[in-house]
Amino acid sequence: MADYKLKNIYEITPKMLLDMGVKAVFLDLDSTIMVSKSGKFLPETYKWFETLKKDFYIAIVTNNKNPEYTKLTKKAIPFKVVECANKPNPKKVKELIHLIAMKPEEVVMVGDRPLTDILVGKFAGTKTILVGSINDNENLPTKIVRALERSVIRHF
């Protein structure tokens, strides 16, 4: 279902994105670029952002509805944060694409969840990259949900 599947975000390079014809990168928040519910970015994530921000428009698209949590995120990074995105509903992603005056095919949606992140990208007409969690030490319920999602997706 995803156009690309990678171990984590750090495998995404500017060259790869340029070769894909991408001008904007929309990123899921929890478990994709930030350890889930931590409210903090890893130092290597900030370094990765630095490699991308000069060539690409970057935005965070999250289903998170906690205003304190998204406030922390907005303070920590200089990118647009679209909260309460209601993924996989593509409405907010399409609105953001329109706002930045790009074509859907110039955007890539990156996330760790096939049934939310990848589907929203597909519904909005963007390219998609499915990545593994940024956290190798996820709790058991999260690991089970992730395995079930990926198992279901393999059948489509």
Locations of the language-model features?
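Asp-based, Mg2+/Mn2+-dependent phosphohydrolase catalytic module
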Residues: 1-27, 34, 38-39, 43-57, ...
